[in-house]
């Protein structure tokens, strides 16, 4: 009985580690998450995405809609339970309600992964985890930046800048109009791990040039990993234990002055 109570107390006090995955549209974030969910290695992973349909999860993997859903749908987010014990949430407008849903299921979650839209600034999202409502339940395990290596080699940063611009114009919640180069630098400045995606079709000189560009913008000691088709082992992606929310204020980005103002609530954070 004592051991059971101690285990229950540990589950209630344990913080859920959250990995934030950033990168432009077309970089391969969704491909990466799809591979992670289907190769979870027994981990019960909850994933927050903007659109569930983009993940392309096979219908047979869906166990059912456990919470946050009703027959008319849920505007602020839906939670899907997968057959392997993982969860998938959508968040289109408000961040806080979805986090509250996940906090209520903390004993069923080993790790949380948040995929940003690509235009979202990663630093304010990490800073949201400093708020007491999140800090007591979650910790930012790491920020992972997915880089489209061929696009960077071509000086474009994103695979399809026209599509990224269309995404920008379609997002009413976007509160900045930063050039892609600045966003790219911000994504790298906040990174704990950088994934160089799609390097399999590049020659060594191109890869070396991309690595030089990326290393110039990343903090010292950040690891660069070459990944093809999103195939990365869960043990590499998860479990870095960086507690990024404690150190994020010291990571300098282009938007630091904009981020300095006080927020009334973390609901306004863009994902």
Feature map (PLM): residue ranges:
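Nucleotide-state-sensitive switch-loop elements of NTP-binding domains
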Residues: 12-22, 27, 31-182
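C-terminal accessory "lid"/substrate-recognition subdomains
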Residues: 162-271
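Short, Lys/Arg-enriched N-terminal segments with co-localized hydrophobic residues
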Residues: 1-10
